[in-house]
Curated annotation (Swiss-Prot):
Name of this protein: 3-deoxy-manno-octulosonate cytidylyltransferase 2
Cell compartments where the protein resides: Cytoplasm
Keywords from the UniProt entry: Cytoplasm, Lipopolysaccharide biosynthesis, Nucleotidyltransferase, Transferase
Chain's gene name: kdsB2
GO CC terms of this entry: cytosol
Broad class of where this protein is predominantly found: cytoplasm
Lineage, uppermost ranks: Bacteria, Pseudomonadati, Pseudomonadota, Gammaproteobacteria, Thiotrichales
Pathway this chain belongs to: Nucleotide-sugar biosynthesis; CMP-3-deoxy-D-manno-octulosonate biosynthesis; CMP-3-deoxy-D-manno-octulosonate from 3-deoxy-D-manno-octulosonate and CTP: step 1/1; Bacterial outer membrane biogenesis; lipopolysaccharide biosynthesis
Catalyzed reactions per annotation: 3-deoxy-alpha-D-manno-oct-2-ulosonate + CTP = CMP-3-deoxy-beta-D-manno-octulosonate + diphosphate
Gene Ontology MF: a single term: 3-deoxy-manno-octulosonate cytidylyltransferase activity
Enzyme class: transferase
Organism from which the protein derives: Hydrogenovibrio crunogenus (strain DSM 25203 / XCL-2)
Family as reported in the entry's similarity comment: Belongs to the KdsB family.
Biological process terms in GO annotation: CMP-keto-3-deoxy-D-manno-octulosonic acid biosynthetic process; lipopolysaccharide biosynthetic process
Its biological purpose: Activates KDO (a required 8-carbon sugar) for incorporation into bacterial lipopolysaccharide in Gram-negative bacteria.
């Protein structure tokens, strides 16, 4: 089982066109993500999967690897499946999917999300993992932009939602966790996932990972020590620059 990291990147964005190429402290956002991920141990290579020549040119300019994918890819997972096919990855190879709008993603998060597959007691009962982070900013608890999640006693996801979950009936004395946009799965599962029709809950919440749960597949959740906020709006860039300048 070899591990490959993919960053799906598209130029079009309704709220922030050209998002992967936006400069953060003078460096394209996609470069921040690529360089941080590349520091992780236990991975073979990092690839940007895109259908856009502008992104390809920038990535190759800073020495990154690019896999061009068809423009009709419907999602990041679909784009990654196409890239993995182009690279002739094996069924048991591990694919890590990192959203390209997380310029503060930590290498430790990459190592954490693949750890369940590398564990000595891994029995193949799950083929997908992801990350959570304990919410410290109370505004994120009620923000639909920040996806919350709950797990069972064994650390497997029960549900992901834009709503506040769990929601205390009478009082609030529990921790809440948000989902981070990092996934790991076998190539075999990625191929299977892309054959499944969109789930009802997935369509309502607009959360692709719910498709796996709706069709009965387990998702192992690992709590990360590092937050990795996403860039969605122009104002987020200033926030990222401030965090980078503060040493994040």
């Amino acid at each position: 089982m070899k591990t490959y990291v993919f960053i799906p990147a598209r130029y079009g964005s309704s709220r922030l066109p050209g998002k992967p190429l936006k400069l953060i402290n003078g460096k394209p956002m996609i470069q921040h993500v690529f360089e941080r991920i590349s520091k992780a141990t236990g991975i073979e290579a990092v690839y940007v999967a895109t259908d856009d020549d502008r992104i390809k040119e920038v990535v190759e300019k800073f020495g990154g690897n690019v896999v061009m994918t068809p423009p009709e890819a419907e999602s990041g997972t679909d784009r990654i499946a196409q890239a993995a096919q182009a690279l002739d990855l094996k069924e048991d190879d591990l694919i890590v999917n990192v959203q390209g709008d997380q310029p503060l993603v930590n290498q430790g998060s990459i190592e954490a999300v693949i750890a369940p597959f590398k564990a000595a007691d891994y029995d193949g009962s799950f083929e997908m993992s992801t990350l959570s982070f304990k919410i410290v900013n109370e505004a994120e608890i009620t923000s639909p932009k920040d996806v919350k999640l709950v797990t069972d006693v064994n650390g497997f996801a029960l549900y992901f939602s834009r709503a506040t979950i769990p929601h205390g009936r009478d009082y609030w004395d529990h921790d809440s966790y948000k989902h981070l946009g990092v996934y790991a799965y076998t190539k075999r599962f990625v191929d299977l996932f892309n054959t499944l029709p969109m789930g009802h809950l997935e369509d309502i919440e607009k959360l692709e990972q719910l498709r796996a749960l709706e069709y009965g597949h387990k998702i192992k959740v690992v709590e990360s020590e590092w937050d990795s906020p996403e860039v969605d709006l122009p104002g987020d860039i200033e926030m990222m620059e401030a965090l980078l300048n503060a040493g994040h």
